[in-house]
């Protein structure tokens, strides 16, 4: 099976990806669940170090609150393995990671967003303000 993933790369601290959620009332949900993984073959991820990002919610009055997915929690881990090359006779080369890279299932409790109106969320931001660069693959972001 082929898994479709959204690849997000950043090259400076402070980048942001904004999107409008499919629903606006988050008040009946317990968590924001993110399924993501580091793209280890990209040098923008520091070898051996976990990544850290923030998830920000913005309500319809423009009030916002962000929660960090901390590198100390090791939720977005740098996987074991190494980058290898496969050389072909025609001169072409393929670089690949030699180990399976697991997807991290990260849950952010909705109670951490206590200073905004969870019944009226108009925007979600993924903020890349904790590391200077990185490359993540996202499978899903949802409320549950």
Region locations from a protein language model:
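Beta-rich carbohydrate-recognition modules and glycan-binding surfaces
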Residues: 1-144
